[in-house]
C-alpha cells in the first residue's frame, strides 16, 4: 500500500484543526486472514484496479475459521463498489505517489510493495466469532454471506471468493492449514519458506565478484559522514571496459552504487525501466521478472560502452540524478509536503533534529523550542492573545537556546552595529539602531542580550536621547509581545498590531467589506476616546510593510488570475509569475474600488501621522511602486502622504481628543490635536500653540452624505482663529495645501469665541476615486511659518525608573521609514542600486520628517529559490550573515554603496537601523547526516510520517566564508568591555551565554532543524533497518558491495532450518542477524540469533507483525477478533489519538486512532457522538448501515448518527447513556430516564423533563440559579463567555451563575434576556420603558450615535437611552 500524508482542516468537536491526510491502499487482516489490493505490476507501469473498499461490510454473526473475512470480501467486491483508478508507476514502496485502492491482496506478501524499510504481516492469531465482539471500537456483526472456496485446476490450488474471483497475493488459514496464494497467478504455495536450497538470486557470477567494492574503506566510496546515499558512487574491483572485458579499476574509476545494488526489488525494476526508456536496453520489467538480473547486467554493459564513447561519466551522473529524483523514496513525495492552504510550515514541511548514537556529531543538549516572549520559560506567561509564535520558521533554524549560539549572536550583533568600523575602517558608516526580525520565532533570550548590549555600549537606559539615538524596534506580531516588552523595561518598540489590523479593516478593504471606523478609537494599545491621557507600552504602527499586505495580495492574484490555485506566494513561484501579478496589481492600484491593492492609504496615513503615543512607520511601497527601479515611479498617493509628513512637522503636537460622530447611515471619525504646549482643550498655550494643532475628519464609505452639522472643539488656544485645509478629498482625488500660500482665503474656516470649529452637513460628504474612497479632511491653523517645526528633541536628563523607552513628545516626534520593498527591480546600472539612490536623497527624507531609516537587510542572498526571499534576493535568505555586500554586490549595491548610504542619511540627521535576522541560515554548502523527524512549525511530530528519527542529509555545514573570519572573533574583547553580559543568566536556559566555543563554522549541532529539502525519506541508503555505513565499528555494506574477494566460496545460502527455527544465509554465506531483509520482493526480520520472526515482534521501540511464513504486514489492518490494528508503511502502529484522513481510491476517508495502536471499527461513541467505522476502520458517512437487523443512518457531513429504528441504540461501554434522537442523549437509571440536575462521573449535568440532556443551553437548578451547560459535553461551566447550541452567547460569573439584564463586563455595557442570551444587533426596552440598542458585532450598548430601528431613527445619548429625531 502506498501512502502520501498530507494535512487539511477538519472539523472536530466544532473546532477546525489540522489533521494528517494519507493517500493509501489498504490491506486488512481479520481473524488470521489478510486482505489487500493487487494494484500494480511492480515495475513502474500502470494498471487498472477495481475499487474494493467496502462501504457496508457484511459479517456472519456465527462466522468461524475465516468466514468473517470471507464474508467481508464478498461485500468488498459488490458490483456497486467497482470503479477504476489509474495507478501511477511504482517507484518507492515505502512512500509513493500512487493512489492504489484497498482490495483482496494480502499484505502478508509484500512482493508487490516496494518498500525500503518493511512493514509487518500476521503472526498466529486467535480468532473470535463476530458475535462475541463488542461494538465499542470493534467490528459489528451483520448479516451473513456465503464464503468462498478452494478449487483445484490442473493440479494447482486456488481460492475463489463468493464472486468467483481468484484471490491473489493473499494468505489465510483454512481448517488449520496456512495457505498463501501467489500475487501473480493466485496459485497456492507452501506456507513456510523452503530451506536447505540456495536461492536463485545467490548464484555467483562475474558481475557479482567484480562489482564488489575495491575495498571496504571510505576511500572507495562517496559518502556523507560515512553514510552512503542514493547519489553515492564507489570504486568497484573491476570495470567492464567498453562493455566487453573486466579490467582492474583505477582510483578515478567510480560508478553509481545504484548500478550494482538497489534497496529493494521494485527499485531495481524501476532502474531497469528507466534505462529502457533511455534506450540502453529494451523491454519492461517487474520486480519478480526472471530476466531482471540479466537486464541490469545489460544496462551495465551498455553504460560502460557509452562511457568509453563519451570519454567521461558526466552524462551518467546527470542521468543517475534524474533516476534518483524520479523515485518517491528519494524525493519530496516521501517527505509529507503540505501545500496551500494547508501548509504546516512556510516551506511545505519542517524537520526537527534529535540526538542519536548514529549521528553523534549533530547531538545537542539544548534545542528548547518555542521559547518566544510568551513561553520564554517553557510555560505561558502572557494571555492577551492565543497566538504566540512558533519555532521553525524557515531554512536551517538556528538553536538560539544554546548558550554557545547565544554568545555567537552577541558577536554578530556587535559586528553588525560596528560594521563600518570593522569592515570599512570608517566609524561614520556604523549603524545606529536595529530592527529585530521574526521575534515570535526566536528564543526571547536574544532580546535580553540585545537590550543589555545596548545598555552597556550606548547607555540606552541612562537618558532618552541615548535610547532614541539607538532605537530598537521589534517585528513582534503577537499581542503578548507588548506585555513582554513592558516587563523587560520597555527596551524596544513593539507593534500595535490590533491598531494595524483595525486600520486594514476600516481603510484597506474593498468598500463592501470595510469595518466600522468607530473601532479605531479604541483598538490596540491605547483607548484614544475614553482614556486619552494613558501611556501605553512604547510602540510603532504601520498599515503595510515589505512582507505584510503585499506578498499575500500578490499571491492572491497568482491564484485567481494566473490559475495557480495552490500558490501561497512564498514557494514554487518564479519571477515571471511575479511580473505578471504586478501588472495586475499596479493596474488595480489605479482603480476606484480596489480588489487586490489596499484602498485608502492616504486615509490611513492621515490617521496614523496625527495620533499621539505611537510612532508611525512609513512604508516605501506606499510612496513608490513596490516593483520597478528604486524610487523611479511614484504611487498616486505620494503627494498626499508627503503633505501629511511635512504637515506633521509643522502642526502635530499637544494633547489629542478622538471621537466618532454617528450620522444616519455611517459616521465620522474625528481627531483634534490641540497644539504644542496644550495637553487639553482648556490649555491656553502660547503663540506656538496657536500656530499648531490639527483637525482630522474621516469617513470610509464611498457614498456617505452627512445629515447634520458637526462641531469640533479645537481648544482654548484657538479661539476666534482661522483654519485652512491641509488635505481635502475631492471628486478628482486629494487636494493638498502644505503652506498658507497654497490656499485661497475663501477656503478658510473660523473658530468661534470658544474655539469651536463647525462644519455644515453639506461640507461632509464622500467621494470615490483612485486615491480615496470616503472622505478625508485635514485642517490646520492659519499663521504658521513655512519652516515651523513643533517636534520635540529627546531629553538628556537621567532616566530614573529603569525603563528605556517612555511615551513622550520626543518619542512621538519620531517617524520611521522602511526604505525598501521586497519586490523592487534588480538594478540595471550601478546608479540604480538602492543604496546608491539612498545616498543621494538624505535631504528629501529629512524634509519628510524621517528620523529613523530602516534599511533592507544587507546580507548577500542565497539564490536557491526555495522561498520567496531567495527568489527576489531581498536579503532575508542568506548563507553567511557576516557577508554584507562583501563577497559580491547584494541586491542593494556594493559595500561602498552601503557605507555611502549610511553616511548620507546620518549627515542629514537621520539615524540608520540595521536589520538583525537571527533565526535562519539558507543552503549552507556542506552536507551533514542528521537524525530528523518530520514535524510542523511548532516541532510537533507528523503522524504517520516516514521521516521519524531517520538519518537525513541536511545542508548544515558552512566553510570558507566570512563566518570563518568573524565568527566569535569579538567575544574576548566584549568580555573585557562588558563582563556582565557574560554572567547574566538567561531566562530560558538558566545559564549565561557561553563564549568558550567560537562558531567559525556552522553545523547541525547548532540548529533546531531545517525545512524539508526534497531528498526523500530514504536518501540515506539502508538495507532493511540497517543503514549503509563505513564508519569504524559501524561498517555495514550489502552483500553485493561488500569486498569478500579471495575469501572461501560459500557452500550454501538462502533459508535454512536451524535450532528449531528458520534462518537465512546471504550470498556470502553470512547469516543475517538483527535486521530486516528483503528476499524475492518480501520483507523478513531475523533476530539477534538469526531466527526468522513471526507474529508480533518488538524491534527497538516499535512492534511489528509478521505472518507465519515470516512475511511482513505493512500499510494494513490486523483484526485479532477483538481489536483492529493499523500498521503503516513502516510496519508500525500509530499511538497518536484522534482522526486521521486517508486518501483511498480518490476519496477522502477517515479513521479514528485510539492512542494504543488500535483503530475504531463498528459502532462507536466518541465525545457523545455515535459514529460507525467499517471493517477497515473507515468512517461511514451518508449511508445507512444494518447491524443485527437494525438500521442506522449516518449523516454525510460529519458522519453522526441521525436516524435509527432501535429505541435504545447507545454504544456499549456507555453505562446508562441512551441516544434519544439526533444527538440527543439521556441517562437511564433503574429503568427510568433521569431529569433535572445530576452529577454523573463527577460532572454536573442537567436533563429536561423529557430526559434529554441540556447541551449548549441554560437551565435553572433546584436553588433557582440559572446555569449554563456547554455544547460539547453538557457539563456545567465556570466563569466566562460561552456559545450556545444556536450560536448565541451567555456570560457566567464567578459563582457559576448565568447573568441576565443590563451588565457591565470588561468595560462594555451589555444586555442578557431572562434566559441569559446576549442581545446583539437588537433594541431592548428595559423595565423603566427606556429603549437601548446593542451592537450586532460586540454587543456593546450604543452611545452618542444615531440608529435606525424598525424604520425609525433614534439618537442614543451618552447613557445609551434613545430619543427620537
From Swiss-Prot:
Residues 1-36 form the signal peptide. It catalyses: [(1->6)-alpha-D-glucosyl](n) + sucrose = [(1->6)-alpha-D-glucosyl](n+1) + D-fructose. It is an enzyme of class 2 (transferase). Glucan synthesis by GTF-S is independent of primer glucan unlike GTF-I. The keyword Repressor does not apply. GO terms for biological process: glucan biosynthetic process. One of its GO terms (molecular function) is dextransucrase activity. Residues 80-99, 127-152 are annotated as: Disordered. InterPro entries: Cell_wall/Cho-bd_repeat, Glucan-bd_rpt, Glyco_hydro70cat, Glycoside_hydrolase_SF, KxYKxGKxW. It holds the Pfam family Glyco_hydro_70. The keyword Transferase applies. Disulfide bonds: none annotated. Cell wall-binding repeats lie at residues 146-166, 168-187, 1052-1071, 1073-1092, 1093-1112, 1113-1133, 1136-1159, 1160-1179, 1234-1253, 1278-1298, 1299-1318, 1343-1362. Its EC number is 2.4.1.5. NCBIfam families: glucan_65_rpt, KxYKxGKxW. Belongs to the glycosyl hydrolase 70 family. This is Glucosyltransferase-S. The lineage of its organism: Bacteria, Bacillati, Bacillota, Bacilli, Lactobacillales.
Amino acid at each position: 500500500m502506498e501512502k502520501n500524508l498530507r494535512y487539511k482542516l477538519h472539523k472536530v468537536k466544532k473546532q477546525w484543526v489540522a489533521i494528517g491526510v494519507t493517500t493509501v491502499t489498504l490491506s486488512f487482516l481479520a481473524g488470521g486472514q489478510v486482505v489487500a489490493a493487487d494494484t500494480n505490476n511492480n515495475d513502474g507501469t500502470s494498471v487498472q484496479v477495481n475499487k474494493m473498499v467496502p462501504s457496508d461490510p457484511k459479517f456472519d454473526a456465527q462466522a468461524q475459521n475465516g468466514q468473517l473475512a470471507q464474508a467481508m470480501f464478498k461485500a468488498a467486491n459488490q458490483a456497486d463498489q467497482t470503479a477504476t483508478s489509474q495507478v501511477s508507476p511504482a517507484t518507492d514502496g515505502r512512500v509513493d505517489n500512487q493512489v492504489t485502492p484497498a482490495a483482496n491482496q494480502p499484505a502478508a506478501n509484500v512482493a508487490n510493495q516496494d518498500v525500503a524499510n518493511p512493514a509487518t504481516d500476521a503472526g498466529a492469531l486467535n480468532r473470535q466469532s463476530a458475535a462475541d465482539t463488542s461494538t465499542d471500537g470493534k467490528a459489528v456483526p451483520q448479516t451473513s454471506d456465503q464464503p468462498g472456496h478452494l478449487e483445484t485446476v490442473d493440479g494447482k490450488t486456488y481460492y475463489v471468493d463468493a464472486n468467483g474471483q481468484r484471490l491473489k497475493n493473499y494468505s489465510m488459514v483454512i481448517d488449520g492449514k496456512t495457505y498463501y496464494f501467489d500475487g501473480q497467478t493466485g496459485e497456492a504455495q507452501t506456507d513456510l519458506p523452503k530451506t536447505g536450497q540456495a536461492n536463485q538470486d545467490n548464484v555467483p557470477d562475474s558481475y557479482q565478484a567484480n562489482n564488489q567494492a575495491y575495498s571496504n574503506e571510505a576511500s572507495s566510496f562517496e559518502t556523507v559522514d560515512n553514510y552512503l546515499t542514493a547519489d553515492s558512487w564507489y570504486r568497484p574491483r573491476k570495470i567492464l571496459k567498453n562493455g566487453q572485458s573486466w579490467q582492474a579499476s583505477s582510483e578515478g574509476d567510480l560508478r553509481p552504487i545504484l548500478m550494482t545494488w538497489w534497496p529493494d526489488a521494485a527499485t531495481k525494476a524501476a532502474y531497469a525501466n528507466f534505462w529502457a526508456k533511455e534506450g540502453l536496453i529494451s523491454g519492461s520489467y517487474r520486480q519478480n521478472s526472471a530476466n531482471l538480473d540479466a537486464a541490469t547486467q545489460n544496462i551495465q554493459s551498455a553504460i560502460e560502452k557509452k562511457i568509453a564513447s563519451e570519454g567521461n561519466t558526466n552524462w551518467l551522473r546527470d542521468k543517475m540524478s534524474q533516476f534518483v529524483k524520479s523515485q518517491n523514496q528519494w524525493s519530496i513525495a516521501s517527505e509529507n509536503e503540505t501545500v496551500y492552504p494547508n501548509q504546516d510550515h512556510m516551506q511545505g514541511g519542517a524537520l526537527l533534529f534529535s540526538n542519536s548514537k548514529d549521528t553523534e556529531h549533530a547531538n545537542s543538549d539544548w534545542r528548547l523550542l518555542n521559547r518566544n516572549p510568551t513561553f520564554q520559560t517553557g510555560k505561558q506567561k502572557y494571555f492577551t492573545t492565543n497566538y504566540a509564535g512558533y519555532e521553525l520558521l524557515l531554512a536551517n533554524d538556528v538553536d538560539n537556546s544554546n548558550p554557545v549560539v547565544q554568545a555567537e549572536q552577541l558577536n554578530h550583533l556587535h559586528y553588525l552595529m560596528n560594521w563600518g568600523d570593522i569592515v570599512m575602517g570608517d566609524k561614520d558608516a556604523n549603524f545606529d539602531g536595529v530592527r529585530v526580525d521574526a521575534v515570535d520565532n526566536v528564543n526571547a533570550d536574544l532580546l535580553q542580550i540585545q537590550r543589555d548590549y545596548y545598555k552597556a555600549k550606548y547607555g540606552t537606559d541612562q537618558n532618552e536621547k541615548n535610547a532614541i539615538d539607538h532605537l530598537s524596534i521589534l517585528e513582534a506580531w503577537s499581542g503578548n509581545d507588548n506585555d513582554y516588552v513592558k516587563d523587560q523595561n520597555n527596551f524596544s518598540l513593539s507593534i500595535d498590531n490590533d491598531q494595524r489590523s483595525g486600520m486594514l479593516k476600516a481603510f484597506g478593504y474593498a468598500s463592501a467589506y470595510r469595518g466600522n471606523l468607530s473601532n479605531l478609537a479604541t483598538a490596540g494599545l491605547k483607548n484614544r476616546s475614553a482614556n486619552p491621557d494613558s501611556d501605553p507600552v512604547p510602540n510603532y504602527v504601520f498599515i503595510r510593510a515589505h512582507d505584510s499586505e503585499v506578498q499575500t495580495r500578490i499571491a492572491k492574484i497568482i491564484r485567481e488570475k494566473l490559475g495557480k490555485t495552490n500558490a501561497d506566494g512564498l514557494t514554487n513561484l518564479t519571477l515571471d509569475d511575479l511580473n505578471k501579478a504586478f501588472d495586475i496589481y499596479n493596474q488595480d492600484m489605479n482603480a476606484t474600488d480596489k480588489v487586490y491593492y489596499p484602498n485608502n492609504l492616504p486615509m490611513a496615513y492621515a490617521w496614523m501621522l496625527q495620533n499621539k503615543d505611537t510612532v508611525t512607520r512609513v512604508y516605501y511601497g506606499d510612496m513608490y511602486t513596490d516593483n520597478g527601479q528604486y524610487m523611479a515611479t511614484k504611487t498616486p498617493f505620494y503627494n498626499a502622504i508627503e503633505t501629511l509628513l511635512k504637515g506633521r512637522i509643522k502642526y502635530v503636537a499637544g494633547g489629542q481628543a478622538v471621537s466618532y460622530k454617528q450620522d444616519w447611515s455611517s459616521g465620522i471619525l474625528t481627531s483634534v490635536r490641540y497644539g504644542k504646549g496644550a495637553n487639553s482643550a482648556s490649555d491656553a498655550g502660547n503663540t506656538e500653540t496657536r500656530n499648531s494643532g490639527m483637525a482630522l475628519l474621516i469617513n470610509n464609505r464611498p457614498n456617505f452624505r452627512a445629515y447634520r452639522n458637526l462641531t469640533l472643539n479645537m481648544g482654548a488656544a484657538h479661539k476666534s482663529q482661522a483654519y485652512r485645509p491641509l488635505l481635502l478629498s475631492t471628486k478628482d482625488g486629494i487636494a493638498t495645501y502644505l503652506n498658507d500660500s497654497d490656499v485661497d482665503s475663501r477656503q478658510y474656516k473660523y473658530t468661534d469665541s470658544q474655539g469651536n470649529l463647525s462644519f455644515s452637513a453639506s461640507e461632509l460628504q464622500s467621494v470615490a476615486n483612485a486615491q480615496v474612497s470616503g472622505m478625508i479632511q485635514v485642517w490646520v491653523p492659519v499663521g504658521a511659518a513655512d519652516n515651523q517645526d513643533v517636534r520635540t528633541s529627546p531629553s538628556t536628563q537621567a532616566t530614573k525608573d529603569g525603563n528605556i523607552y517612555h511615551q513622550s513628545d520626543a518619542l512621538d516626534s519620531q517617524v520611521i521609514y522602511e526604505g525598501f520593498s521586497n519586490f523592487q527591480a534588480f538594478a540595471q546600472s550601478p546608479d540604480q542600486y538602492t543604496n546608491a539612490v539612498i545616498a543621494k536623497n538624505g535631504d528629501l527624507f529629512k524634509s519628510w520628517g524621517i528620523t529613523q531609516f530602516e534599511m533592507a537587510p544587507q546580507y548577500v542572498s542565497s539564490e536557491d529559490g526555495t522561498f520567496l526571499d531567495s527568489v527576489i534576493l531581498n536579503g532575508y535568505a542568506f548563507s553567511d550573515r557576516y557577508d554584507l555586500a562583501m563577497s559580491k554586490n547584494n541586491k542593494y549595491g556594493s559595500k561602498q554603496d552601503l557605507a555611502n548610504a549610511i553616511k548620507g542619511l546620518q549627515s542629514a540627521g537621520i539615524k540608520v537601523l540595521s536589520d538583525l535576522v537571527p533565526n535562519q541560515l539558507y543552503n549552507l554548502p556542506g552536507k551533514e547526516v542528521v537524525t530528523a523527524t518530520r514535524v510542523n512549525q511548532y516541532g510537533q511530530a507528523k503522524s504517520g510520517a516516514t521521516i521519524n528519527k531517520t538519518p537525513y542529509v541536511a545542508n548544515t555545514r558552512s566553510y570558507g566564508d566570512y563566518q570563518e573570519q568573524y565568527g566569535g572573533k569579538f567575544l574576548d574583547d566584549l568580555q573585557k568591555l562588558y563582563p556582565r553580559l557574560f554572567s547574566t543568566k538567561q531566562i530560558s536556559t538558566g545559564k549565561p551565554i557561553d563564549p568558550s566555543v567560537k562558531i567559525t563554522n556552522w553545523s547541525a549541532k547548532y540548529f533546531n532543524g531545517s525545512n524539508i529539502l526534497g531528498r526523500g525519506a530514504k536518501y540515506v541508503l539502508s538495507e532493511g533497518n540497517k543503514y549503509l555505513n563505513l564508519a569504524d565499528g559501524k561498517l555495514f555494506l550489502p552483500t553485493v558491495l561488500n569486498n569478500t574477494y579471495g575469501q572461501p566460496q560459500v557452500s550454501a545460502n538462502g533459508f535454512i532450518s536451524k535450532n528449531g527455527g528458520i534462518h537465512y544465509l546471504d550470498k556470502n554465506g553470512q547469516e543475517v542477524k538483527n535486521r530486516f531483509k528483503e528476499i524475492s520482493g518480501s520483507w523478513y526480520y531475523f533476530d539477534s540469533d538469526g531466527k526468522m520472526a513471526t507474529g508480533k515482534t518488538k524491534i527497538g521501540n516499535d512492534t511489528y507483525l509478521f505472518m507465519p511464513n515470516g512475511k511482513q504486514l505493512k500499510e494494513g489492518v490486523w483484526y485479532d477478533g477483538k481489536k483492529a490494528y493499523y500498521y503503516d508503511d513502516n510496519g508500525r502502529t500509530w499511538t497518536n489519538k484522534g482522526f486521521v484522513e486517508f486518501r483511498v481510491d480518490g476519496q477522502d476517508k477517515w479513521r479514528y486512532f485510539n492512542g494504543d495502536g488500535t483503530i475504531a471499527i463498528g459502532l462507536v461513541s466518541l465525545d457523545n457522538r455515535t459514529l460507525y467505522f467499517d471493517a477497515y476502520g473507515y468512517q461511514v458517512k451518508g449511508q445507512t448501515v444494518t447491524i443485527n437487523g437494525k438500521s442506522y443512518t449516518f449523516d454525510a457531513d460529519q458522519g453522526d448518527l441521525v436516524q435509527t429504528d432501535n429505541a435504545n441504540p447507545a454504544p456499549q461501554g456507555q453505562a446508562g447513556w441512551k441516544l434519544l434522537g439526533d444527538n440527543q442523549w439521556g441517562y437511564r437509571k433503574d429503568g427510568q430516564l433521569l431529569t433535572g440536575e445530576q452529577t454523573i462521573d463527577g460532572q454536573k449535568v442537567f436533563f429536561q423533563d423529557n430526559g434529554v440532556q441540556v447541551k449548549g443551553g441554560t437551565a435553572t437548578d433546584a436553588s433557582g440559579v440559572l446555569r449554563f451547560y456547554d455544547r460539547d459535553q453538557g457539563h456545567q461551566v465556570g466563569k466566562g463567555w460561552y456559545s450556545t447550541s444556536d450560536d448565541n452567547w451567555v456570560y457566567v460569573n464567578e459563582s457559576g451563575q448565568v447573568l441576565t439584564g443590563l451588565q457591565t463586563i470588561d468595560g462594555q455595557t451589555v444586555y442578557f434576556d431572562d434566559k441569559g442570551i446576549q442581545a446583539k444587533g437588537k433594541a431592548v426596552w428595559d423595565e423603566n420603558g427606556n429603549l437601548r440598542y446593542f451592537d450586532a458585532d460586540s454587543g456593546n450598548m450604543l452611545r452618542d450615535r444615531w440608529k435606525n430601528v424598525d424604520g425609525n431613527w433614534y439618537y442614543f445619548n451618552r447613557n445609551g437611552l434613545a430619543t427620537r429625531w
